[in-house]
Amino acid sequence: MPDFRIKDHPVLTAPGDATVPFSWKGQDMKAREGEVISSALFANGVRVFGHHHKDGSPQGIYCANGQCAQCSVVADGLSVKSCMVAVKPGMKVEPLEGKAGLIDAPGPLQFHEIETVDTEVLILGGGPAGLSAAIELAKAGVGVILIDDKAALGGKLVLQTHKFFGSIDACHAGTRGMDIGEKLEAQVRSYENVRIWTETTALSVFSDRKVGVLRQGHYVLVRPQIILVATGARERSLVFKGNSLPGVYGAGAFQTLVNRDLVRPSERLFVIGGGNVGLIAAYHALQAGIQVVGLCEALDECGGYKVHKDKLVRMGVPIHTRHTVVC
């Protein structure tokens, strides 16, 4: 069976071996401890997770951030977003083809009393904005609950292996993004008036100002005085025929696979977009041992920092300005 895991990286340390057994369409596979289903499938060479309900075209991942549902599968009888759910020992994973059926559960569902939690401020999102807001509020003595749908805080900072530019005070210049995330998290956790709930999603805001959240499988009502929304970036794709096929990914999904989960989605890569995200993603690919066959930008010049572009040029990456993709 092919293994697409990155074992050697100039910045990141590869985690332990894949020892958690699971199956995909009846085929035995292994995942790393805590690895999400989508990354485990990619590491085992699976790129097609299902097929589009309209035309039957193959579907894989797009955002790998829990937003688009394109990577949905059936895991142990439940329809889940594969990029958000960790593999469990013995888990049976199948494609979500058509409508999911009802699970075979004995007896009626057991309901529990819903807990209501009060707080001064509820922050939705544990990325750089949410963490920074929590720090400033905590300094002022404000009670905060900070929630994030991932298992770890930091948002997109977790995916950034390069060193940041700017001033040291304003944006931690000279520090890698992933290390900035750890610094901000440590600072937030040092305040007793901040409660952190990971693997938690806000589901609804009711007319009485209560917020329904799903916290690690349990429903909780939060009654905040103020709601601060810091839900972060979303993938935006260039519109062209075939842009949802396996092999076409958002930059964030690519960085999630390569930099967070150390999984190589391909051996060769072409990047669309010469802004900072595209330029940096191309460099991340080179760090992971992926051949970047080119980068295109529709404008006359790349819009990202020249230092990022020059780095790619020095490493032999062809950059095509005034070019785009049509299909």
Q: Where in the sequence are the language-model features?
A:
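Signature of N-terminal electron-transfer/Fe-S-associated modules in redox systems
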Residues: 1-117, 218
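Aromatic/His-enriched, Gly/Pro-containing loop or helix-boundary segments
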Residues: 57-63, 172-181
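FAD-binding core/adjacent interface of flavoenzyme oxidoreductases
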Residues: 55-57, 75-122, 159, 180-268
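A Rossmann-like FAD-binding core segment of flavoenzymes
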Residues: 182-213, 222, 286-327
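Rossmann-like dinucleotide/flavin-binding elements
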Residues: 109-149, 232-302
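Cysteine-centered iron-sulfur cluster-binding motifs in ferredoxin-type domains/subunits
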Residues: 30-35, 60-69, 123-132, 138, ...
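Conserved N-terminal glycine-rich FAD pyrophosphate-binding loop of Rossmann-like flavoproteins
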Residues: 151-175, 235-247, 304-308, 315
